[in-house]
């Protein structure tokens, strides 16, 4: 009966604005489109209540931008942070975190599927939208009309070169380039076995033909949690409601 009433009343075109408001409210309640700050996105909750109590020693921040997330990690944990940012202008700002001494390493390079030089597409007025993928230009709000050539390495080769044997947490926010990061990180995922892996999931992945289920299947020994406002909830990656192409952060936790 309730479903019939809902269909009868809310399917009316005159109520479309109300429907959209309700839909957006529901999406935000589930952890989507909460991007204004780290508390709203659930990232501060994760660092404070989940990550920090495990006393992490080594953390990788892939797609660090100017270091807002790296800075919070440095403040809330005693870990050493390796931060990767390929866009030169953002890297120069990221380097300011060098005040943390040997606890912080900034790398002006990207992480991908191969060791090679790639074209980074960007908008100087919206540097957080920079991406190695041209597909993300199909996202209506992305206007990456400029480009630069930058160095890209695999996570596997970087860890081998630096003799890194332990990684407690990897955060990946690379504007739709996450599948390539995964392709170059098989040794890290299977041998180093980080406890936590966070990825940003967004509209970009629709145009990369990638779902959250795709990432989950690459991490068979991990449970999936979606960050919500000041919290997190365990999700089933096979559920369509977990694969909505709106901004959200998911954390994979090793069994």
Range-by-range predicted roles:
Residues 1-255:
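Phosphate/nucleotide-binding beta-alpha loop and adjacent structural elements of enzyme active sites
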């Amino acid at each position: 009966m309730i479903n019939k009433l809902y269909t009868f009343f809310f399917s009316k075109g005159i109520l479309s604005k109300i429907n959209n408001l309700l839909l957006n409210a529901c999406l935000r309640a589930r952890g989507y489109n909460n991007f204004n700050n780290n508390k709203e996105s659930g990232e501060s909750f994760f660092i404070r209540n989940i990550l920090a109590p495990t006393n992490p020693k080594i953390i990788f921040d892939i797609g660090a931008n100017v270091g807002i997330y790296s800075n919070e990690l440095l403040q809330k944990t005693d870990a050493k942070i390796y931060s990767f940012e390929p866009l030169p202008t953002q890297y120069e700002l990221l380097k300011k975190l060098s005040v943390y001494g040997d606890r912080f390493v900034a790398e002006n390079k990207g992480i991908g599927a191969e060791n090679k030089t790639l074209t980074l597409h960007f908008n100087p007025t919206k540097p957080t939208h920079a991406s190695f993928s041209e597909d993300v230009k199909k996202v209506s709000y992305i206007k990456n009309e400029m480009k630069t050539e930058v160095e890209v390495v695999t996570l596997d080769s970087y860890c081998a070169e630096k003799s890194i044997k332990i990684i407690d947490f990897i955060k990946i926010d690379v504007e739709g380039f996450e599948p390539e990061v995964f392709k170059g990180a098989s040794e890290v995922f299977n041998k180093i076995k980080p406890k936590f892996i966070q990825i940003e999931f967004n509209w970009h992945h629709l145009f990369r033909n990638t779902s959250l289920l795709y990432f989950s299947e690459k991490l068979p020994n991990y449970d999936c949690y979606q960050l919500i406002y000041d919290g997190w909830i365990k999700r089933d990656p096979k559920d369509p409601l977990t694969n909505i192409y709106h901004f959200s952060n998911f954390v994979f936790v090793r069994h």
